[in-house]
Amino acid sequence: MAIAERHLMSGLKLQRLGMLMEQEPGNAQEVEGVLNPAAARGPDGELYLFPRLVARGNYSRIGIARVRFNKAGDPAGVERLGIALEPEADYERRPDGGGGCEDPRITFVEPLQIYMMTYTAFSPEGPRIALALSKDLFHWKRLGLATFGPYHGVECGDVDDKDASVFPVAIPNPSGHPELAILHRPLFPGTRPEEIVRHPAARKVDLDRESIWISYCVMSLESRESNRFGRFMSHHRLATPVSPWERLKIGGGTPPILTRHGWLIVYHGVSEMEKPSVGEHQLRYSAGVMVLSKEHPQIIRYRSVEPVLTPTLPQECSGTVAHVVFPTRHRPARRSRPTQSLRRLLRDGRQPDWCRKA
């Protein structure tokens, strides 16, 4: 699990700081990997990680660890504190004894004054988005699976889904009513990268590649305690693969944070490796930046033409899954400020230096 931090100074820069958390020798809960963590700052002011811990047989739990900082103020290590969630609900377990609580994201939802975790529950039917709430980050109440209403005649209830995160404030839905908004990546049949990797161009079907969607549900203190909470009834396809580095699919990454330019997310895109070695994984996961309109997040103000992070280090080119960088949380630097280059790219759409390949 590597960390990278953005410094908004004379220009937006991305610097790798190193490995923050690795598999603990002798820990059976981590024998197959430690990856894809959520992060959140608790009521005590501490920063906590919620990594996916993978045991033998791809059995995944969500751990909790306190981040330790060095004298320079950079993350330097973690203190393991136990398990936040492990497969217990029916929708997290499979008949063969397997299961998983995977790839969490955590947002403090301000109108509800509560932390919301979105995670992938590896159910008997396949991966689904599950929700949980907490007041302190240590005690979590499951809300069950998120459900999605039909979209233009397409039934979404039985569609696999991943990479979910919610906005921290109410967002106008397509009708203009403020609701809880979630970013997610439905896996419609026939859209997986392995299925379309040899297709030279998009097919006629509108839902031909995995994309980032935004969906909405009623949000209030009353709805939180009812069975209406987590029922997302209106939808909008936010973004589809555009650039070569994301040709096969895109998916959500970090939960959205508000800047003066709009909602900032770091997302992932997948492309085919040009010259994969024999027996190697043929897909490459990279990261890009997207900025959404503050008032109308379904409007994209900017997105990366080139990736801002690609797998280059040995730990990124081999391991649990090869050739992958996968963003799940960003933490603004303490003295971060908007830059001229960011203002310029939002004004005229030009690609700044920090979005170009080295």
Label the predicted regions:
Residues 164-169, 253-255, 327-332:
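Beta-rich, blade/repeat-based domains predominating
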Residues 1-32, 36, 40-99, 108-161, ...:
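Beta-rich carbohydrate-recognition and catalytic domains
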Residues 102:
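Metal-dependent C-N hydrolase catalytic cores
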